[in-house]
């Protein structure tokens, strides 16, 4: 009977640690890396590079899009920081949990139970906070997607050959070309006519087609960005769904942990299983914190 109780305790405790570790591992390997933020940083810089290539109306939309993308990134990293904080607490608690196996008694068993419940409680709290931050991040992506649709329509109008914006760009090219032709004249009125003819050929045959190609490349850039933002929004939604499942699993195992008797006679194999589960989660925490810039990692107790 005692052995059955011990087996049950080991199963519950091991499952509790592994469930928390699994949620963290999911965040570490999937949720936290789902968006290629380096690409987005480069894209945000590109938004500024194109600022001379669209109308005032389009410029306002581009400014809104840039703000929304930066807001989304801020909230995403806020979620990352929340999980980082959980790791900081969990590593210390789990190290204390492992050390309590030395000269094991009922008081230490009770302390271990409190520790595990604390780890699970903090996990639920921090992952829920991360979930909320991801929701806001997703909403910003969604809003940016809507703005990009409006921008596409605006650019289509701007870049139409009949639009006032396109004509203003053509007029600017012609003015600069003809001014340059006039400045270069040395052969009297006939020279001016010839220079203007050459300028007209350059404008119509080269500069205006180049303008069309440049404007087309700008529109293609924003079309690609629109597709990227839509995919990012889908990825975050999928991440939130996975996280919801993990939070629910931690909640269930926490309830079971609270009702489990911890002070039982463990054999060496049982002790090894529990210690290894705790050490594995400490290592997962270390891996997560290292990837986010922590230089000095928590040492796993050798007991």
From Swiss-Prot:
Disulfide bonds join 87-285. Keywords: Cytolysis, Disulfide bond, Hemolysis, Host cell membrane, Host membrane, Membrane, Periplasm, Secreted, Toxin, Transmembrane, Transmembrane helix, Virulence. It holds the Pfam family HlyE. Changing residue 157 to H: Strongly reduces cytotoxic activity. GO terms for cellular component: extracellular region; host cell plasma membrane; membrane; periplasmic space. It is found in: Secreted; Periplasm; Host cell membrane. In periplasm, it forms a disulfide bond between Cys-87 and Cys-285, which prevents the oligomerization. In outer membrane vesicles, the redox status prevents formation of the disulfide bond, leading to oligomerization and pore formation. Induction: During anaerobic growth. Weakly or not expressed in most strains. It is activated by SlyA, while it is silenced by H-NS. Its expression is also regulated by CRP and FNR. Gene3D superfamilies: 1.20.1170.10. Signal peptide: none annotated. Changing residue 268 to A: Strongly reduces cytotoxic activity. It is a single-pass membrane protein. One of its GO terms (biological process) is hemolysis in another organism. One of its GO terms (molecular function) is toxin activity. InterPro entries: Hemolysin_E. The chain crosses the membrane at residues 183-203. Toxin, which has some hemolytic activity towards mammalian cells. Acts by forming a pore-like structure upon contact with mammalian cells. Belongs to the hemolysin E family. Monomer and oligomer. In periplasm, it is present as a monomer, while in outer membrane vesicles, it oligomerizes to form a pore structure that is active. The pore is formed by a dodecamer. This is Hemolysin E, chromosomal. It comes from Escherichia coli (strain K12). The gene is hlyE.
């Amino acid at each position: 009977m005692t052995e059955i109780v011990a087996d049950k305790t080991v199963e519950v405790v091991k499952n509790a640690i592994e469930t928390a570790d699994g949620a963290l591992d999911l965040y570490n390997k999937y949720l936290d890396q789902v968006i290629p933020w380096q690409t987005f940083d480069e894209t945000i810089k590109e938004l500024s590079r194109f600022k001379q290539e669209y109308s005032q109306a389009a410029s306002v939309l581009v400014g809104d899009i840039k703000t929304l993308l930066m807001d989304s990134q801020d909230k995403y990293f806020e979620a990352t920081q929340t999980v980082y904080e959980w790791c900081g607490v969990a590593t210390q608690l789990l190290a204390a949990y492992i050390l309590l196996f030395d000269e094991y008694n009922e008081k230490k068993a009770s302390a271990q139970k409190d520790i595990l419940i604390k780890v699970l409680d903090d996990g639920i709290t921090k992952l829920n906070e991360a979930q909320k931050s991801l929701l806001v991040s997703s909403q910003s992506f969604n809003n940016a997607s809507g703005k990009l649709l409006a921008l596409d329509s605006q650019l289509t109008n701007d870049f139409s050959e009949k639009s006032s914006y396109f004509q203003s760009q053509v007029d600017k090219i012609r003015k600069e070309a003809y001014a340059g032709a006039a400045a270069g004249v040395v052969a009297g009125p006939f020279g001016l006519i010839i220079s203007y003819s050459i300028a007209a050929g350059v404008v119509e045959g080269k500069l205006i087609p180049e303008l069309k190609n440049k404007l087309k490349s700008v529109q293609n850039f924003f079309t690609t960005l629109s597709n990227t933002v839509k995919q990012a929004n889908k990825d975050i939604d999928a991440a939130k769904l996975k996280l919801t499942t993990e939070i629910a699993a931690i909640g269930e195992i926490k309830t079971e942990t609270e009702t489990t008797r911890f002070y039982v006679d463990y054999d060496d194999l049982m002790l090894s299983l529990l210690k290894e589960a705790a050490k594995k989660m400490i290592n997962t925490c270390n891996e997560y914190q290292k990837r986010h810039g922590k230089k000095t990692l928590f040492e796993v107790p050798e007991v």
